[in-house]
Amino acid sequence: MQGNDCFCQVRKISSSLDLLAPGCSVVWLARLLWEQEAVSSNLTIPTIQFPLFLPSYFFLTGYCIMDHDTYGISRWGDGLVGILPNGNIGLHDPLSPDNQPVDLAGVIQKLEKRGIQTPVLLRVSNFLEHRIQVINESFNDAIQQVGYQGNYRGVFPIKVNQQAHVVERISEYGEPYHFGLEVGSKAELLIALSQNVNPEALIICNGYKDSEFIRLALLSSKLGMRTVIVMESVRELNLIIEVSRELGIPPTLGVRVKLVNVVSGYWSATSGDRSSFGLSIAQVVEVVEVLRRENLLNALVLQHSHLGSQVPNMIEIRKFVQEASRLFIEIKKLGANLQYLDLGGGLGVDYTGENSSSPNSINYSLEEYCYSVVETVGFEMNDAGVEHPCIVTESGRACVAQSSMLLFSVLESTSYESDGVVLAEEGDHPLLCSLIELSDGLSNDNLLESLNDATYYRDELRALFRRGRLSLPVLARAERAHQRILGQIRVRMESLDDAEWSEELNQRVQGMADIYHCNFSLFQSLPDVWAIDQLHPIIPLTRLHEKPDRNAILCDVTCDSDGRIDRFVVADGVSDCLPLHSLDENEEYYLGAFFVGAYQETLGDLHNLFGDTNVVTIRLKEKGEFELLDEVEGDTVSEVLSYVEYEPKRLLEKFKARAEHAVKDHGASLEELKELVSTYRESLRGYTYYESD
């Protein structure tokens, strides 16, 4: 039995488990069996089988990766993210599952050697290729299982991630599946028309369109592209007809229809008959009559409806698909040449791993989604005796969310606990004495009472300070005494079962979590966390063989109280704080925010003039190696200043002039002048984020 290839059957020794580290008995036993290469006569029925590749220190800490997953990685990681034996996070190649995972901390180290500092947005091309593959293959499998007579054509909505390296790879990876693109503006249409998509792929044009937009879409047919112009209004139809006749190019049309079903989730407003886009039932009938009158009814080949983004509930999806199918049947009865049923977006991502209908989760699998869609469409078409249409979906989030992660360092932490003992001194205020004495009387039975008393005494002492009746050093001792009580209460709570805590006690102690100050901008890199309370899994990238000993919230580097994260994905759901490790001043502590590939890059803003981060795309390879495919440097200070109408060259000239005056008026030396100007110039060239020396 050797190394990673060694497997052993573990049997339970009933008489000696109490001697082993808590939570590690099975792992420790396996270690002993491996080293001795023998099985004691005490052992009975085989119960567990697993690889033995764990380092020796792993069995001495009392905290075992295999027995404990603080962050719920096994639930939300989807096989892409896992914990390595050294306690680091590893990235697993879903295209080659037998490959050794890539150590994410090692990726950061190699990037830094190239001069690429964190924060960095890391894209993994394997993850993107795999998602496109499994979405298309899941639909094809469902079509075979149901006996559906049509086919599937997916399209990627460019708005979900417009970045060139992303769209280009989607076009490449989607080519075997005739995977197309969806656009909602002229700029996005120009992107789509430049991509090498499969000739069978669809280019679907949504959004409001002027004559130039329509002209581009019509002319693209001369390139052999299947471009469908989806009508958003009756007025738009008249413009399409006018431009089409001017060019002498017949249009290929779709119609966007508002359905009455309203779904749950953050984006429920995009569904229902009060949604912003699409035609009402009455307007659809009007459009059909206009097309009939203009002899263009055969041009109407696609019906589009949009359910919304990140729809968590499968029942709602089925109802939506049923309604869309019935409408398709009725429009076809009016004489339209409908061939494509575009069901829009909605396929969600399980950010929390809860498999629930909460906004950040989904209560269905990809396979269930595809099967339910195909089955529902097929049933309705069969019932009406209508030929099965080609099913189209615009599953942007499900394509790209998992493929990107934000990696950043923790700069420092602020703790609200004190380990130091505060002793009463002669002449101390009685309230301070009472606060200090609470530590001696603390027990598991009076935790909430003691917290109430400590808070009362501290608040009264603060009031005395405000009235000038207490000195600053005495108030500082009171604050330390209060923090010590909090620390003692938290330690006692860790030894108790959750059932022994009161909810109030838990909330109040969590509300006093540490603050970990991190090198990123929430507004630039994770805007949905600020805007709609979106959850992204956030975990340490190292030290996962150690038990976290701190509870924390995260703050970014912006000077804004909203630049904080205080809801986190953990093993048992969602928590108000994140378990983390105490910082080591001799070692960088990195965190990763996962599944950030959908919408975040373009929605990010320049709050405090923190610009785009460095962006790197890698390819996971064999033997735990990776290949650097693309690197895009983050914004420099100079670039960000130019975005807000400053001319960096002019700024430098003005600063030089001011520095010259300083030499004349304040006696600054020429050497100091030179250093000032040099520092200013270098700062203009620098990264907008905190840079390590």
Cite the ranges covered by each PLM segment.
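Short, positively charged low-complexity motifs
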Residues: K12-S16, S25-V27, S40
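Charged (often Lys/Glu-rich) extended helix/loop segments that serve as interaction or gating elements
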Residues: T70, G378-D693
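Short, glycine-/Ser/Thr-/acidic-enriched flexible segments
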Residues: N88, S96, F127, N161-Q163, ...
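Conserved, well-structured core domains of diverse proteins
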Residues: G62-Q117, R619, E627, V637-V640, ...
